[in-house]
Amino acid sequence: MHKLRKIIHIDMDCFYAAVEMRENPALRDKPIAVGGSVQQRGVLTTCNYPARKFGLHSAMPTGQALKLCPDLILLPVNITLYKQVSHQIKQIFHRYTDNIEPLSLDEAYLDVTDCVQCSGSATWIAEEIRRAIFNELHLTASAGVAPLKFLAKIASDQNKPNGIFVITPGEVDNFVKTLPLSKIPGVGKVTGQKLLQMGLKTCGDVQKLDLTVLLNRFGKFGQRIWQYSHGIDEREVQSHWQRKSVGVEDTLLRNITDIEQGIVELERLYPILEQRIKRACPDIPFERFRKLGVKLKFEDFQVTTLEKSAVEFKRENFIVLLRQIWQRRQGRAIRLVGLQVTIPEQKAEQQMSLW
C-alpha cells in the first residue's frame, strides 16, 4: 500500500501581470496584459483581473483582446524579471521541503509528507507559504492541498484568486464523485464534448463504466480518465532541481540605515543559516563552505548581492561582506538582509557513497 502523501499545488495569480503591477502600482486597477504586439501577431501570456472582466484570457490573440478592451495596457514579456521572482518564490518553498516539482515559473507541486514545520499540517504549511509570498514579494498565490497530485492541482483553482482549498483523505471519494470531467487535467473542449456524447458529465458517471470502454474510445488517455475518476493517482512529486546554495533572509519590521543595526540582524540570521546548512548538507563539513554571500533589499525594492570566496566559513567574514555591500546603499534604507553560501561540489568518493 502506498504511503499517504501530503501534496500542495501552488499557483501564482496572473503571475506576469501581478509582477508588473507590483513594479508599477499605478497599473493595479487598470486592465493590463503581458504578451506580444499586434504587429508580431502576438497573443496574451496573461492578464490581470480587471482585464478578465472584458473576457480576456491567456493565449488570446492580442488583436482580439484590444477589440474587446480598447483601453488595454499591453506590456512586453520581461522574462528575466519573472525568472528572478520565480526563484525567490522557490526559495520560500525550500524553507519547508526540497521535494519540489516546478511546472512553470509560476506553478509547482510540493510534497510536504515528511515536513515537521507547522506540526506537519499541510494546510498550515500552504497558508504560511502564501503569507510569505504576499508579505515578502507582494504577490498572491492560490494553493490546493490533497493526497493526490491531480486533486491538489484542481483544488488550487477552486478559490482563485488568493485562496486555498483543502481535500482531506476522507473527503476524496465524495469530492471525486461529483467532480465534472472538464476539471480533469488534459480534458479539453474536444475530449469533453466526446465524453458528453457518451453521457458522461462527472467522475461518478465514469465510475459506472468498465475501463475497456474508455480505452477503446480514448486510448491511453482513457485509462488516465478512468483512474482519476476513481481517485487513483500514483504519480509522485518529482524533483529535478539540484540545490546550489543555502540561504536565509528576513524582511525587517522597520527599515534600517545604520550598519550596526545590519550587523545585529546578521548576528541573528547566522545561526539559522548554520542550522539550514546542517539540514540541507549533513555530509559536508562547514570548513568546505567558502563561497559566502550577503544580500540586501532596499526601500525601493531593488536587490543587490555580494559573493566572495573566503578562507573559512565564519561569522566575521559575513560581517566583512556586509560592510562592503552597505556602501551600495546610496542613502536608501534597508528592508531585507540575507545570507547565503554556495554548496561545494562533492568529491568523487562522497558521490559514490550515495549509492
From Swiss-Prot:
SUPFAM superfamilies: DNA/RNA polymerases, Lesion bypass DNA polymerase (Y-family), little finger domain
EC number: 2.7.7.7
Active-site residue list: 107
Cofactor list: Mg(2+)
Residues involved in Mg(2+) binding: 11, 106
Cellular compartment(s): Cytoplasm
Principal localisation: cytoplasm
Pfam families: IMS, IMS_C, IMS_HHH_1
One GO CC term on file: cytosol
Family of this protein: Belongs to the DNA polymerase type-Y family.
Protein name: DNA polymerase IV
